[in-house]
């Protein structure tokens, strides 16, 4: 595994971002509510709240587009866990935004999957993102 020590704050921020996306999808809360909650609950932690806020707002704004991409990849709510869907939302949104190189997005998504999801989910995430890259260049 790559040394992520130099990117500790960004890595930790993305971990919290996955939790926030999960909350958004599970409870259908608005990004602003979740952002305020996370800022209050985690104000003493070393997190990049600008990255967190920009990403979560972008996901909310791109939600229909992300959903349509998931449908085009044959990913339906009935066959995906919410945590895996959260990771896919993160990855697709990052690729739409273009702030991170695509290989970095894929590596980070696989790392997040291994941390938060079932042991084999990273294979599903990897295959889905590979399919996305082949169809959405």
Question: What are these regions, as identified by a protein language model?
Answer:
Residues 1-115, 119-122, 126-137:
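N-terminal interaction/assembly modules
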